């Protein structure tokens, strides 16, 4: 992750939705991001959108794991 401003996004989910979303995050792949990204978009730190998407997905997954939602 490039050095940038960190933002906080409050999120309130019922437990079943949090569990299902954690599963979704676990099952998402770099290829999923590649298919959905804009191949022409780059960010101010010169990273391609696919790489920023993938990093964001992994960061959200780690935050879920920190509060006990880490599917195997």
Predicted regions and their residues:
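Positively charged, low-complexity terminal tracts
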Residues: 1-15, 19-72
């Amino acid at each position: 992750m490039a050095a940038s401003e960190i933002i906080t996004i409050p999120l309130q989910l019922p437990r079943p939705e949090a569990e299902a979303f954690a599963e979704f995050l676990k099952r998402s792949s770099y290829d999923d991001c590649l298919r959905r990204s804009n191949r022409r978009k780059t960010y101010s730190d010169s990273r391609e959108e696919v790489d920023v998407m993938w990093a964001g997905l992994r960061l959200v997954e780690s935050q879920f794991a920190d509060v006990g939602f880490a599917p195997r």
